[in-house]
UniProtKB/Swiss-Prot annotation:
Task performed by this protein: Responsible for synthesis of pseudouridine from uracil-55 in the psi GC loop of transfer RNAs.
GO MF entries: RNA binding; tRNA pseudouridine(55) synthase activity
SUPFAM superfamilies: Pseudouridine synthase, PUA domain-like
Family: Belongs to the pseudouridine synthase TruB family. Type 1 subfamily.
The keyword Metal-binding is assigned to this record: no
Record's protein name: tRNA pseudouridine synthase B
Species annotation: Dechloromonas aromatica (strain RCB)
Length: 299
C-alpha cells in the first residue's frame, strides 16, 4: 500500500543553505516534504553550481516572496583566471586559455571599474526567453542571438583572496546581476580571461547566511526541531514600520477595507492585531491605510 503524505498548512520562512549540485526547485521540494508543507516557494533561483542562502517561504509567507526577488544580494565568488568557457562558469566548454601573470596591484586597479551602475549583456546560458524559448535551449543547439544590455548596480567589490590563478571576491549587487558575466568581464579587463569557478550567496536583502540551515541538518531533526528553525512570516518584513489595529478596525482590515492612517506614515507598513500579523498596508485614496496583502496564519 502506497503511503500518501498528509500535507498541512505551515506558515514561515526557512533560511536554507543550498547544497552544491542541486537546483533551487529541488531544494525547495525536499524541504517542503520535510515540513509536509502544503504550499511553498523560493525567493530567487540559485544555479546548481552555486551554494548558500536560499530563503524558502511556506504558506502565507509566499505572499511576500516577490519582495526578496527584488532585494539586493551579496555573493562570494571564485574566479578562475586564464580560462574562459562558453557558459561563463565551470559547467561550460573551454573556449580559450592564457598564461596568468597578474599582480595584486593590477586586480586592485581593475575592480573599481566595475563598481556603480554598469551594463551587462545576459549570457546565452540563461533562463531569459526569446520568442518563448529559454536562451539556454538555443545555446545548446549552437545558436547565439543578440541580447540587449541590462542596467545593474554593483555596490561594492572586495578582494578576499588572490592566489595563483584563483581570485576570490565579495560582490554586493542589485537584483538581476549575472556574477558569471561579471567574472568574464573582470577576466577580460585583466587581459587573461576568466570564468566563475564557484559561487556562494551570503546575503539577501537584510537576511544573512549565518542564520541558515542545511538540508542534511534538517533531516536529523524531529518535527519539533524543524519547526524551531522556521522563522515567522514577518521575518521578511522587518524593514517595514509597525501599525497596530484593534476591534472594528482590525475586522475592516481583515476583510480588505481601509482603516485610519497613522500620522507620519508615508509608505508600506506591516499591520498587527492582538500581536499577530494580519497583513501589509499602504497609504491610499482618502488618506487611509489600504490593505495590500492579507495573511491568515494557522493557529
Amino acid at each position: 500500500m502506497q503511503f500518501k503524505r498528509a500535507w498541512k498548512q505551515v506558515d514561515g520562512v526557512l533560511l536554507l543553505d543550498k547544497p552544491l549540485g542541486m537546483t533551487s526547485n529541488d531544494a525547495l521540494q525536499k524541504a517542503r516534504r520535510l515540513f509536509s508543507a502544503a504550499k511553498g516557494g523560493h525567493t530567487g533561483t540559485l544555479d546548481p553550481l552555486a551554494t548558500g542562502l536560499l530563503p524558502l517561504c511556506f504558506g502565507e509567507a509566499t505572499k511576500f516572496s516577490a519582495d526578496l526577488l527584488d532585494a539586493d544580494k551579496t555573493y562570494e565568488a571564485v574566479l578562475k583566471l586564464g580560462v574562459t568557457t562558453d557558459s561563463g562558469d565551470a559547467e561550460g566548454q573551454v573556449t580559450s586559455t592564457a598564461m596568468v601573470d597578474i599582480q595584486k596591484e593590477q586586480v586592485s586597479e581593475v575592480l573599481p571599474r566595475f563598481v556603480g551602475d554598469i551594463q551587462q549583456i545576459p549570457p546565452m546560458h540563461s533562463a531569459l526567453k526569446r520568442n518563448g524559448r529559454p536562451l539556454y535551449e538555443l545555446a545548446r543547439q549552437g545558436i547565439e542571438v543578440e541580447r540587449e544590455p541590462r542596467a545593474v548596480t554593483i555596490f561594492a567589490i572586495d578582494c578576499l583572496d588572490f592566489s595563483g590563478d584563483l581570485l576570490t571576491l565579495r560582490v554586493a549587487c542589485s537584483k538581476g546581476t549575472y556574477i558569471r558575466v561579471l567574472a568574464a568581464d573582470i577576466g577580460k579587463a585583466l587581459g587573461c580571461g576568466a570564468h566563475l569557478a564557484a559561487l556562494r550567496r551570503i546575503v539577501v536583502g537584510d537576511i544573512r547566511l549565518g542564520n541558515s540551515v542545511t538540508l542534511a541538518e534538517l533531516e536529523t531533526l524531529d518535527e519539533a526541531g524543524r519547526m524551531e528553525r522556521l522563522l515567522p512570516v514577518d521575518a521578511l518584513l522587518q524593514s517595514l514600520p509597525i501599525v497596530g489595529v484593534e476591534g472594528p478596525e482590525a475586522e475592516r482590515f481583515r476583510h480588505g477595507n481601509p482603516v485610519s492612517l497613522p500620522a507620519g506614515l508615508a509608505g508600506k507598513a506591516r499591520v498587527y492585531a492582538e500581536g499577530r500579523l494580519i497583513g501589509v498596508g499602504e497609504p491610499g485614496h482618502g488618506g487611509l491605510l489600504w490593505p495590500k496583502r492579507l495573511v491568515q496564519l494557522a493557529d
